[in-house]
Amino acid sequence: MASKGPSASASPENSSAGGPSGSSNGAGESGGQDSTFECNICLDTAKDAVISLCGHLFCWPCLHQWLETRPNRQVCPVCKAGISRDKVIPLYGRGSTGQQDPREKTPPRPQGQRPEPENRGGFQGFGFGDGGFQMSFGIGAFPFGIFATAFNINDGRPPPAVPGTPQYVDEQFLSRLFLFVALVIMFWLLIA
């Protein structure tokens, strides 16, 4: 009887011990599926998981790219708290093969790509500036490209004349003459 009591009491303990271990295995298996960490940037299973001091979990490659693209404003992508390479903690799980700090591994930089130059075609070699041909469309004396002409954008004209030279005096005279003509035309439009 005494031997039955301990064996009987051992049996429930074994079954209860087996139950939790069995349930923990079952929970571990189902928890294994649910216990994968998701990166808050790519929303995929975190590779080389790191956790920020504010409690958000990321893949190290994703967080590294986030920090590299914003060197002046390093904030957590989720809560905008301050974050840096030194303010994240690597996570190591059971069964992980490598115990190397993921912060020591820097993802490879993407290869640069040079786009092909565009084919200008058309008017090359005809003496139109640098090979391009420009036109300004407008109605009468009011071109639609007024900002392009006023700010000398994409223009192949020579620089203005140096003050004091005869060319400068001639340009000033022509400028005033055309201003006077423009004012006369505008006055005529107002009274007509």
UniProtKB/Swiss-Prot annotation:
Residues 1-130 are cytoplasmic. GO terms for cellular component: endoplasmic reticulum; endoplasmic reticulum membrane; endoplasmic reticulum quality control compartment; mitochondrial outer membrane. It catalyses: S-ubiquitinyl-[E2 ubiquitin-conjugating enzyme]-L-cysteine + [acceptor protein]-L-lysine = [E2 ubiquitin-conjugating enzyme]-L-cysteine + N(6)-ubiquitinyl-[acceptor protein]-L-lysine. Its EC number is 2.3.2.27. Residues 152-171 are mitochondrial intermembrane. The RING-type zinc finger domain is responsible for E3 ubiquitin ligase activity. This is E3 ubiquitin-protein ligase RNF185. It comes from Homo sapiens (Human). The lineage of its organism: Eukaryota, Metazoa, Chordata, Craniata, Vertebrata. The gene is RNF185.
